[in-house]
Amino acid sequence: FPTRRSSDLRLKVINYIQKYIDMVDTPFPKAQLVINELFDKRIGDEEFLEIYSASLYKNRQKDRITKRTNLGINKQELIVKHKEKDQLAKFCSTGEQKALLISILIGQIEANKEIAKTTPILLLDELFVHLDDMRKDCLAQYVINSKLQTFITATDMAGLNRITESGQIIYI
């Protein structure tokens, strides 16, 4: 049952990242990560196989026409919500979306440090755009304190002074 196992693995990873999003104390809004389910989790493996096989058969003609698979793990979506507001991220302001993304990023970094016992290399593009001063300061402190190797690209130097003492700036 590769689709079910893949789905379960994705859910396990998302739940682990969610644990760290909830655990880490930052001024960034807590993101809530949810994966839409393709099939009811309460059905047994045999019934799942029957339903999945029938669904694949039913979609064959559509798959041929579109030249792609229209049913499967590739159709699972990650849904992100602003936890405190109980609002889908796609309906949040650009600044809130950026803050939610940073919340997810920090959660993923902390989960990765715990699971893999490694620290990732951070690549951040236009890091401080759409953030208020308090969040800029908090993010700069996180980057500095995390001791992660970090590459930040920016078109505007405003905000980068928060971390220049701890790093090196290369002008291109």
Where are these regions (language model features)?
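H-loop/switch region of ABC-family ATPase nucleotide-binding domains
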Residues: T153-T155
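Walker B catalytic acidic pair
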Residues: D125-L127
